[in-house]
Amino acid sequence: MTENAQAAQPVFSIEKLYVKDLSLEVPNAPKIFLDRENPQINVQLRTEASNVDEGVFEVTLTVTVSSKLPEDRTVFLVEVAQAGIFQIRNIPEGDLEAVMMIGCPNILFPYARESVSDAITRAGFQPVVLAPVNFESLYQAQQQQQAAAAAQAGELPIQ
Protein backbone atom coordinates (compact mmCIF):
# COMPACT_ATOMS: atom_id res chain seq x y z
CA MET A 1 0.00 0.00 0.00
CA THR A 2 1.36 3.43 -0.88
CA GLU A 3 1.78 6.19 1.69
CA ASN A 4 -1.10 8.17 0.17
CA ALA A 5 -3.43 5.17 0.34
CA GLN A 6 -2.45 4.53 3.96
CA ALA A 7 -2.94 8.19 4.83
CA ALA A 8 -6.47 8.11 3.38
CA GLN A 9 -7.57 5.06 5.40
CA PRO A 10 -10.27 5.79 7.99
CA VAL A 11 -8.87 6.05 11.52
CA PHE A 12 -10.86 5.58 14.72
CA SER A 13 -9.01 5.14 17.98
CA ILE A 14 -9.63 5.76 21.65
CA GLU A 15 -6.99 8.06 23.09
CA LYS A 16 -8.38 8.45 26.63
CA LEU A 17 -11.52 7.62 28.63
CA TYR A 18 -12.26 9.52 31.84
CA VAL A 19 -14.94 10.76 34.22
CA LYS A 20 -15.26 14.47 33.49
CA ASP A 21 -17.82 15.19 36.20
CA LEU A 22 -19.62 13.17 38.86
CA SER A 23 -22.21 14.46 41.30
CA LEU A 24 -24.47 12.77 43.81
CA GLU A 25 -27.17 14.40 45.89
CA VAL A 26 -29.26 12.83 48.66
CA PRO A 27 -31.15 15.93 49.82
CA ASN A 28 -33.54 14.17 52.20
CA ALA A 29 -31.03 12.04 54.09
CA PRO A 30 -31.22 10.56 56.68
CA LYS A 31 -35.03 10.40 56.80
CA ILE A 32 -35.24 9.07 53.25
CA PHE A 33 -33.57 5.82 54.39
CA LEU A 34 -36.54 5.10 56.67
CA ASP A 35 -39.06 5.38 53.82
CA ARG A 36 -40.29 2.04 52.48
CA GLU A 37 -42.10 3.30 49.37
CA ASN A 38 -40.93 2.31 45.91
CA PRO A 39 -39.38 5.28 44.13
CA GLN A 40 -39.73 6.19 40.47
CA ILE A 41 -36.45 6.12 38.56
CA ASN A 42 -35.89 8.55 35.69
CA VAL A 43 -32.89 8.31 33.33
CA GLN A 44 -31.80 11.02 30.90
CA LEU A 45 -28.94 10.85 28.40
CA ARG A 46 -27.16 13.63 26.55
CA THR A 47 -24.21 13.40 24.15
CA GLU A 48 -21.98 16.32 23.19
CA ALA A 49 -18.93 16.42 20.94
CA SER A 50 -16.26 19.05 20.42
CA ASN A 51 -13.20 19.33 18.23
CA VAL A 52 -10.03 19.33 20.36
CA ASP A 53 -7.47 19.29 17.55
CA GLU A 54 -7.35 18.31 13.90
CA GLY A 55 -8.93 14.85 13.77
CA VAL A 56 -9.19 14.67 17.58
CA PHE A 57 -12.56 14.98 19.31
CA GLU A 58 -13.85 14.93 22.86
CA VAL A 59 -17.20 13.19 23.21
CA THR A 60 -19.06 13.47 26.51
CA LEU A 61 -21.97 11.24 27.47
CA THR A 62 -23.90 12.69 30.41
CA VAL A 63 -26.16 10.28 32.28
CA THR A 64 -28.58 11.72 34.85
CA VAL A 65 -30.48 9.34 37.11
CA SER A 66 -33.06 10.67 39.53
CA SER A 67 -35.15 8.77 42.03
CA LYS A 68 -38.31 10.30 43.49
CA LEU A 69 -41.03 9.21 45.87
CA PRO A 70 -44.65 10.36 45.68
CA GLU A 71 -45.18 14.02 46.54
CA ASP A 72 -42.04 14.79 44.49
CA ARG A 73 -39.62 13.90 47.29
CA THR A 74 -36.15 13.28 45.88
CA VAL A 75 -34.43 10.10 47.02
CA PHE A 76 -31.22 10.73 45.07
CA LEU A 77 -29.87 12.46 42.01
CA VAL A 78 -26.74 11.21 40.24
CA GLU A 79 -25.11 12.81 37.22
CA VAL A 80 -22.07 11.36 35.50
CA ALA A 81 -20.29 12.98 32.56
CA GLN A 82 -18.21 10.19 31.05
CA ALA A 83 -15.88 11.53 28.38
CA GLY A 84 -13.44 10.22 25.86
CA ILE A 85 -10.86 11.63 23.52
CA PHE A 86 -11.11 9.95 20.15
CA GLN A 87 -8.91 10.20 17.09
CA ILE A 88 -11.26 10.21 14.10
CA ARG A 89 -9.70 10.86 10.70
CA ASN A 90 -10.54 10.32 7.06
CA ILE A 91 -14.22 9.71 7.76
CA PRO A 92 -16.60 11.22 5.19
CA GLU A 93 -17.98 14.52 6.52
CA GLY A 94 -21.56 13.21 6.39
CA ASP A 95 -20.65 10.23 8.59
CA LEU A 96 -18.56 12.06 11.20
CA GLU A 97 -21.52 13.19 13.32
CA ALA A 98 -22.98 9.67 13.34
CA VAL A 99 -19.65 8.21 14.49
CA MET A 100 -19.50 10.72 17.35
CA MET A 101 -23.17 10.36 18.34
CA ILE A 102 -23.48 6.57 17.95
CA GLY A 103 -20.08 4.88 18.04
CA CYS A 104 -18.47 6.95 20.78
CA PRO A 105 -21.43 6.83 23.22
CA ASN A 106 -21.56 3.04 22.73
CA ILE A 107 -17.99 2.93 24.03
CA LEU A 108 -18.61 5.40 26.88
CA PHE A 109 -21.92 4.00 28.16
CA PRO A 110 -20.61 0.93 30.06
CA TYR A 111 -18.20 3.16 31.99
CA ALA A 112 -20.94 5.68 32.79
CA ARG A 113 -23.29 2.86 33.83
CA GLU A 114 -20.67 1.51 36.24
CA SER A 115 -20.04 4.97 37.74
CA VAL A 116 -23.79 5.54 38.25
CA SER A 117 -24.30 2.16 39.92
CA ASP A 118 -21.22 2.60 42.12
CA ALA A 119 -22.23 6.10 43.27
CA ILE A 120 -25.77 4.98 44.14
CA THR A 121 -24.48 1.95 46.06
CA ARG A 122 -21.94 4.06 47.98
CA ALA A 123 -24.77 6.42 48.93
CA GLY A 124 -26.46 3.52 50.73
CA PHE A 125 -29.10 2.55 48.15
CA GLN A 126 -29.71 -0.56 46.11
CA PRO A 127 -27.74 -0.34 42.85
CA VAL A 128 -29.51 0.87 39.74
CA VAL A 129 -28.31 -1.11 36.73
CA LEU A 130 -29.04 0.83 33.57
CA ALA A 131 -30.36 -1.14 30.62
CA PRO A 132 -28.35 -1.11 27.38
CA VAL A 133 -29.10 1.85 25.12
CA ASN A 134 -29.53 1.80 21.35
CA PHE A 135 -27.70 5.01 20.46
CA GLU A 136 -28.37 4.48 16.76
CA SER A 137 -32.15 4.64 17.23
CA LEU A 138 -31.77 7.67 19.55
CA TYR A 139 -29.66 9.42 16.90
CA GLN A 140 -32.15 8.60 14.14
CA ALA A 141 -35.06 9.87 16.26
CA GLN A 142 -33.15 13.09 16.95
CA GLN A 143 -32.46 13.53 13.22
CA GLN A 144 -36.16 13.02 12.43
CA GLN A 145 -37.17 15.58 15.08
CA GLN A 146 -34.71 18.11 13.68
CA ALA A 147 -35.97 17.50 10.12
CA ALA A 148 -39.60 17.90 11.26
CA ALA A 149 -38.76 21.11 13.14
CA ALA A 150 -36.93 22.46 10.10
CA ALA A 151 -39.89 21.57 7.86
CA GLN A 152 -42.30 23.38 10.19
CA ALA A 153 -40.04 26.42 10.15
CA GLY A 154 -40.02 26.31 6.35
CA GLU A 155 -36.37 25.35 6.10
CA LEU A 156 -34.92 22.57 4.01
CA PRO A 157 -33.06 19.89 5.97
CA ILE A 158 -29.31 19.77 5.36
CA GLN A 159 -28.27 16.48 3.80
Swiss-Prot record:
GO biological process, one term: protein tetramerization
UniProt main location, coarse: cytoplasm
Compartments, as annotated in UniProt: Cytoplasm
Keywords noted in UniProt: Chaperone, Cytoplasm, Protein transport, Translocation, Transport
GO cellular component: cytoplasm
Keyword Chaperone: yes
Pfam family, one: SecB
Keyword Translocase found: no
A single GO molecular function term of this UniProt record: unfolded protein binding
Family: Belongs to the SecB family.
Assembly description: Homotetramer, a dimer of dimers. One homotetramer interacts with 1 SecA dimer.
Function description: One of the proteins required for the normal export of preproteins out of the cell cytoplasm. It is a molecular chaperone that binds to a subset of precursor proteins, maintaining them in a translocation-competent state. It also specifically binds to its receptor SecA.
Protein name as annotated: Protein-export protein SecB
Organism of origin: Aromatoleum aromaticum (strain DSM 19018 / LMG 30748 / EbN1) (Azoarcus sp. (strain EbN1))
GN (gene name): secB
